[in-house]
């Protein structure tokens, strides 16, 4: 049994997330966490809301609420939606927690102690129209590198190049759109990432198993242009972690807060400490996951995120960890994702474009969405959500293949033998061939899941479902029953065991449907199959079952058209 630490990029507090956010981090992280638990590993799965920075301040102002109150309410909303989507976090924390505040200040103090913090007088953009300094991400303009006209002052989302606001061509306030901007002098703390460049470069080179998407972005930031730059880690804002050197005041930094991208990744650690607190455990309980001098050297740490978060997780956060000089656990594997697009354009939280998590659940249960999103995960390139594709995938994969199989087998058994596994007959060459085929496919499925190859795993799982359907069609128990009820009983006995087998294997993808099938099979305690032949004999003759409710309903053309129309504009 291994110990696996899993973190998902933490979502901003400023509103309910769309399906593109979900498939880029939380959902594949949940898939892996559920699979790892099913295989018997000890798992710690941490996520949180990212509550600091200008987005939180602006969203609270728009809602007419104090920012702390707004964040508390939105955390509750996001937590509830996550539960309804079946996201199995061990803890869903808050970056505004006291734990994160203390840890962020602690790391800053250690970095300063080690000569890796520099005080810099710099010029920062002030917006007269907004009456405030503008954080980097709230200045928009044209990227000097690729010409994208909605580049932000910290990074171009189009080419991923790291930017400063003064690099932008024709800059404007992202808040008001005003171009009445003035550059003023202010003092900030910088993390001397450049001093750790060689160490970071060597560390990334050692990660030969990382996805190309992850390493290529990290290398670009390390070597393009002037190479890795020092990074400002403080801001002139009211809301955030107050700047302190450990527990001491930091002269000249009064009234400033740490940059959201400095404190947000530290919340992975703080969130684990919050988990310990919530469960009445001492610090040793969370330190064994994070301190290599206290047991974390045995932990495999995996992070999930969208590609726009890669630079901060491959460079800035590791620089914080390395620079502290303390024995903290560094990430072992970063699984990054491209973007999910929506009917030819971008999903957008700020513009309200696309389908959002709460809206999705108003239409259909979570498993419909989980299956489509994971089986179309944007791993090697961007993926596009279309209502036609969604309908086809749900109807063919979930309704026609998996749901139809469970329905046919259980209903036929009930009509001919009653609601218990029938006795009689024995497995023959066809059944042995199916067991051999499923053994090969199960090992392939496990291999893809171990490697976090999400789309390949989904395709293999579907192939496992299809194999059972093809067997049932060829074996034709409805015909065999007329002349040899015992032989038909053996076919149906295998079929009922296949329903149980499928439910166990499908649980990481579609947990609610899997749980319903296992309840119907009265096999809630079913564990991951080691041997396929044993798994397909797990329900013996005489074992009671119930015919399950419709596992997945088909999506009609009328529904598809209505939803496409409903979500063709932007959210209010």
UniProtKB/Swiss-Prot annotation:
Binds 1 zinc ion per subunit. Zn(2+) binds at residues 143, 146, 156, 159. It is an enzyme of class 6 (ligase). Its cofactor is Zn(2+). The keyword Ligase applies. The keyword Ligase applies. GO terms for cellular component: aminoacyl-tRNA synthetase multienzyme complex; cytosol. InterPro entries: Anticodon_Met (IPR041872), Met-tRNA_ligase_1 (IPR023458), Met-tRNA_synth (IPR014758), Methionyl/Leucyl_tRNA_Synth (IPR015413), MetRS_core (IPR033911), MetRS_Zn (IPR029038), Rossmann-like_a/b/a_fold (IPR014729), tRNAsynth_Ia_anticodon-bd (IPR009080). It is found in: Cytoplasm. Its main location: cytoplasm. Its EC number is 6.1.1.10. One of its GO terms (biological process) is methionyl-tRNA aminoacylation. A motif ('HIGH' region) lies at residues 11-21. Keywords: Aminoacyl-tRNA synthetase, ATP-binding, Cytoplasm, Ligase, Metal-binding, Nucleotide-binding, Protein biosynthesis, Zinc. ATP binds at residue 349. GO terms for molecular function: ATP binding; metal ion binding; methionine-tRNA ligase activity. It catalyses: tRNA(Met) + L-methionine + ATP = L-methionyl-tRNA(Met) + AMP + diphosphate. Pfam families: Anticodon_3, tRNA-synt_1g. Is required not only for elongation of protein synthesis but also for the initiation of all mRNA translation through initiator tRNA(fMet) aminoacylation. Belongs to the class-I aminoacyl-tRNA synthetase family. MetG type 1 subfamily. Monomer. PANTHER family: METHIONINE--TRNA LIGASE (PTHR45765), METHIONINE--TRNA LIGASE, CYTOPLASMIC (PTHR45765:SF1). This is Methionine--tRNA ligase.
């Amino acid at each position: 049994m291994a110990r696996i630490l899993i973190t998902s990029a933490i979502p901003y507090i400023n509103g309910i997330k769309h399906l593109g956010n979900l498939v880029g981090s939380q959902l594949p992280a949940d898939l892996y966490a559920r699979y790892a638990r099913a295989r018997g590993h000890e798992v710690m799965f941490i996520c949180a809301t990212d509550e600091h920075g200008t987005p939180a301040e602006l969203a609270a102002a728009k809602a007419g609420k104090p920012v702390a109150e707004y964040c508390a309410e939105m955390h509750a909303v996001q937590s509830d939606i996550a539960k309804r989507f079946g996201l199995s976090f061990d803890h869903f924390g808050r970056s505004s927690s006291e734990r994160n505040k203390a840890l962020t200040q602690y790391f800053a103090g250690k970095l300063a102690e080690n000569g890796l913090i520099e005080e810099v007088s710099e010029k920062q953009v002030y917006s007269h129209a907004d009456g405030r300094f503008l954080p980097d991400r709230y200045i928009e303009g044209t990227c000097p590198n690729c010409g994208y006209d909605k580049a932000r002052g910290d990074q171009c989302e189009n080419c991923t190049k790291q930017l400063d606001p003064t690099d932008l061509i024709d800059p404007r306030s992202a808040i008001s759109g005003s171009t009445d901007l003035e550059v003023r002098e202010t003092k900030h703390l910088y993390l001397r990432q450049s001093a750790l460049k060689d160490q970071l470069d060597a560390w990334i080179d050692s990660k030969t198993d990382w996805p190309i998407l992850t390493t290529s972005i990290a290398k670009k930031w390390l070597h393009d242009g002037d190479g890795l730059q020092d990074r400002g880690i403080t801001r002139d804002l009211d809301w955030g972690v107050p700047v302190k050197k450990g527990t001491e005041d930091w002269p000249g930094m009064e009234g400033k807060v740490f940059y959201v991208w400095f404190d947000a990744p530290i919340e992975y650690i703080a969130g684990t400490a919050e988990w310990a607190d919530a469960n009445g455990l001492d610090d040793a309980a969370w330190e064994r996951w994070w301190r290599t001098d206290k047991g974390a050297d045995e932990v495999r740490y995996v992070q999930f995120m969208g590609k726009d978060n890669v630079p901060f997780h491959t460079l800035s956060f590791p620089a914080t960890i390395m620079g502290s000089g303390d024995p903290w656990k560094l990430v072992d594997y970063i699984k990054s994702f491209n973007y999910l697009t929506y009917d030819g354009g971008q999903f957008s939280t700020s513009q309200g474009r696309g389908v959002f998590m709460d809206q999705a659940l108003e239409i259909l249960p979570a498993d419909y969405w989980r299956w489509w999103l994971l089986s179309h995960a944007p791993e090697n390139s961007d993926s596009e959500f279309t209502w036609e594709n969604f309908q086809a995938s749900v109807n063919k994969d979930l309704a026609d293949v998996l749901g139809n199989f469970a329905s046919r087998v259980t209903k036929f058994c009930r009509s001919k033998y009653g609601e218990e596994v029938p006795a009689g007959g024995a497995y023959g060459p066809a059944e042995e061939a199916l067991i051999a085929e499923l053994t090969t496919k199960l090992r392939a499925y496990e291999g893809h899941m171990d490697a976090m190859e999400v789309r390949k795993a989904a395709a293999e799982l579907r192939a496992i479902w299809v194999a059972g359907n093809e067997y049932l069609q060829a074996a034709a128990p409805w015909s065999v029953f007329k002349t040899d009820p015992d032989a038909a009983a053996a076919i149906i006995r295998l079929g009922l065991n296949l329903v149980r087998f499928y439910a166990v294997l499908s649980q990481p993808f579609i947990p609610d449907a899997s749980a319903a099938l296992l309840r119907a099979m009265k096999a809630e305690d079913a564990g991951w199959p080691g041997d396929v032949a044993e798994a397909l004999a797990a329900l013996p003759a005489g074992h009671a079952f119930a015919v399950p409710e419709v596992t997945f309903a088909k999506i009609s053309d009328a529904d598809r058209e209505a939803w496409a129309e409903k979500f063709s504009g932007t959210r209010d």
